[in-house]
């Protein structure tokens, strides 16, 4: 009876105790806990593993050999073991992601600047006037507000400066244009002139603006007239860059053209050149302007010639022999932007016109010389792009590769620098440079080889992988440095100042350029082999006779009382 009462009590348990996933949690709580195996039950591993573990699977013949173990130890349910396995899987996946992703020199500060894309090498024209969003650039918006308030200043100089600055900022918001118009109507003569210039540069070629320009050109002195012409040229430049369907008509154009032609007939100077440029925007096919600009190519200064070339090549499409010769002369300009723009103009002229003019040999020799005489890598790369467009690159590369074997040091160095900009065609040249790096005795040539290899590696992943563990030595002139105590030595601020004497203790980044440091009076040479290889051991004479008696004698000596303490060390 008692057992029946207990069963009845058990079945009378209210159903409110049954909750969701109760059985699952009960099963989980009653499951046995598998602790890590003891040291006696852990499966043993054989070292070294058999060669079978390192063989490549037939389905992946090109895969990198790695260790494959079929027998894996039992998985433990202990949370620490599971956490370690998860971290190991994540590290493996991260490793393969990095392996598949192309390696770039992220640790080196100089590598990203070695190779520049051609889109960055092209000089883009300045953007025309536009609107400004106050949310994107609040500081510039605040500057605009301050300048517009400066137009209402009681001092004339502040008003002139505000009008001048608003024109150069190139922002044509409504409140800016209204403030400039108000000052142009109510201000003094000096302020009016600056306001009209700013309005013209912001794209407002109204009747009153052009009328004010004509008045200034007729009345002002030469210095003030030059400033007016420069402002008019800037306004007409932005006007000429507009699409034809959106380009407005210039009021009083005929009167302005006649006035500019009268200024051209004067002797060649900055004023007449600016007038010719303004007239070139209004009348691109005017023969008078073309003759004046062609005359400027032979008589003017380098900066004046460059201004004339821009108008002739880009606006008037004049590609004569005189223009080509002037472009080649601009490759020797002291201004880096002019040299860069000259390479682009040669691409605009094209190979066919250069051949028709009979200037192929002159162009070839000059571009070939510019490949190694140019001090900046960016310009050398731009020259390489121009040589490629003009279909001269294969011949120049062939000549430079043959010049690598020249006995003259300067010829070898010129070829190495040129190939750094031209690139590499086959592996033989790469291996030849590596051999030259080891065999070359001239330090300047060695440095050029190192720079060429670094430039190649910055744009060629194959060369980059080949040079990953390569360490370059840059030799410096020995300096008399007072040795200090290790405790008081200053840490080098940059890796270039680091002096590595023992590479076994140094963490080498890819293509890390180290400096070989030597004392006065000592000659330091690069080691013949890397420190990562073990040093060859001294050859010992082979043991003769039976070896068992010798071992027994050593064991007997170890058991002696005076040597018994050795076992406890």
Curated annotation (Swiss-Prot):
GO terms for biological process: hematopoietic progenitor cell differentiation; response to cytokine; response to virus. InterPro entries: ARM-like, ARM-type_fold, HEATR9. PANTHER family: PROTEIN HEATR9 (PTHR38323:SF1). This is Protein HEATR9. The lineage of its organism: Eukaryota, Metazoa, Chordata, Craniata, Vertebrata.
């Amino acid at each position: 009876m008692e057992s029946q009462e207990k069963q009845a009590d058990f079945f009378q348990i209210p159903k409110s105790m049954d909750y969701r996933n109760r059985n699952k949690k009960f099963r989980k709580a009653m499951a046995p806990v598998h602790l890590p195996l003891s040291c006696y039950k852990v499966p043993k591993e054989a070292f070294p593993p058999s060669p079978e573990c390192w063989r490549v699977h037939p389905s992946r013949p090109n895969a990198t050999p790695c260790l494959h173990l079929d027998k894996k130890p039992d998985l433990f349910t202990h949370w620490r073991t599971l956490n370690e396995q998860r971290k190991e899987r994540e590290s493996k996946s991260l490793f393969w992601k990095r392996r598949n992703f192309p390696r770039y020199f992220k640790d080196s500060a100089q590598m990203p600047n070695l190779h520049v894309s051609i889109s960055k090498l092209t000089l883009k024209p300045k953007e025309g006037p536009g609107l400004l969003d106050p949310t994107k650039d609040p500081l510039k918006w605040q500057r605009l507000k301050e300048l517009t308030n400066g137009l209402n200043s009681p001092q004339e100089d502040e008003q002139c400066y505000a009008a001048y600055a608003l024109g150069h900022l190139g922002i044509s918001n409504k409140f800016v244009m209204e403030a400039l118009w108000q000052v142009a109507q109510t201000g003094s003569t000096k302020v009016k002139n600056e306001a009209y210039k700013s309005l013209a540069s912001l794209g407002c070629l109204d009747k009153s603006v052009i009328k004010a320009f004509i008045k200034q050109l007729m009345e002002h002195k030469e210095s003030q007239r030059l400033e007016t012409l420069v402002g008019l040229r800037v306004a007409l430049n932005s006007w000429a860059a507009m699409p034809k369907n959106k380009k407005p008509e210039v009021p009083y154009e005929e009167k302005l053209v006649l006035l500019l032609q009268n200024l051209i007939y004067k002797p060649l100077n900055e004023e007449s050149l600016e007038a010719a440029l303004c007239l070139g925007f209004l009348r691109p096919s005017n023969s008078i302007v073309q003759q004046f600009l062609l005359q400027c190519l032979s008589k003017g200064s380098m900066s004046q010639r460059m201004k004339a070339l821009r108008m002739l090549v880009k606006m008037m499409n004049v590609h004569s022999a005189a223009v080509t010769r002037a472009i080649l002369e601009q490759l020797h300009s002291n201004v880096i932007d002019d040299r860069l723009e000259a390479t682009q103009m040669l691409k605009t002229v094209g190979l066919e016109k250069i051949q028709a003019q009979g200037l192929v040999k002159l162009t070839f020799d000059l571009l070939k010389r510019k490949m190694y005489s140019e001090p900046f890598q960016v310009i050398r790369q731009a020259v390489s792009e121009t040589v490629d467009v003009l279909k001269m690159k294969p011949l120049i590369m062939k000549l430079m590769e043959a010049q690598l074997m020249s006995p003259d040091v300067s010829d070898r160095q010129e070829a190495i620098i040129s190939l750094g900009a031209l690139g590499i065609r086959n592996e033989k040249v790469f291996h030849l440079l590596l051999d030259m790096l080891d065999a070359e005795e001239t330090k300047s040539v060695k440095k050029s080889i190192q720079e060429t290899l670094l430039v190649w590696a910055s744009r060629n992943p194959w060369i980059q992988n080949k040079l990953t563990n390569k360490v370059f030595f840059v030799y410096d002139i020995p300096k008399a440095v007072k040795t200090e105590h290790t405790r008081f030595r200053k840490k080098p601020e940059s890796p270039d100042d680091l002096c590595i004497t023992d590479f076994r203790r140094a963490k080498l980044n890819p293509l890390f350029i180290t400096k070989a440091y030597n004392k006065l009076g000592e000659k330091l040479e690069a080691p013949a082999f890397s420190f990562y290889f073990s040093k060859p051991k001294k050859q010992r004479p082979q043991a003769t006779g039976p070896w068992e008696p010798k071992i027994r004698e050593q064991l007997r000596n170890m058991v002696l009382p005076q040597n018994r303490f050795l076992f406890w060390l």
